Amino acid sequence: LASLPDFNPNHLMLSTDDARFNQATKGVFEMGSVFKVLNTAIALETNAFGLNEKIDISDPIRISRFRISDYHPLKRAVSLSEILVHSSNIGSAHISQLIGPETQRSYMKQLGMLAPAPLEIAETGVPLIPEKWTNITAMTVSYGYGISVSLVQTAAAISAAGGDGHYIAPTLLKRSPNVPIERVRVFSPDTAKAVRSMMRLVVAHKSGTGNFANIPGYLVGGKTGTA
């Protein structure tokens, strides 16, 4: 696991507190738009919103003194893939309301986001989760704010959504080929396939927020996020 700044373990006494802090496992952060992958997968899995449906994201969402807007407003109706490709906060927030806060929270729990990562070290950060999972909470969580988790937790959850749909708890130990891997089915193969395709578009589409990662000769998929 990479964590910067790092230190020379042969000279531990010369290291700083910051260098010894494991950013990958102990640090918890608001992951930002990376969470839109999870919101998208949950929407598909629960049939809250389909691939062929569109939703209007022309106007910012205003709730009390809060305002949800997009960095590059599209001012039109968009599909689920467009919400992900263009990283729309407005679209993700609308989709979260179709999913519902209780369902969203349930999936976040299945994806290991509500408890520390079950790693074989003491350096595991405790996620900062909402005390109450309200409609506004669901909106902000849909685009990765209002909840803070570790990098390793995020990697495991995204692997489930964009892999084969199974959640596999992260480990630092080499797995024995003779012992079956414990896995939990969170998303169907169809949902995972659709999410993979959309993550590819984030990188391959000329307007995708991740097009800088489109390397010739490789099928790269991903999702940008501002932590």
Q: Over which residues does each language-model region extend?
A:
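Beta-lactam-recognizing serine transpeptidase/beta-lactamase-like catalytic domain environment
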Residues: 1-33, 38-227
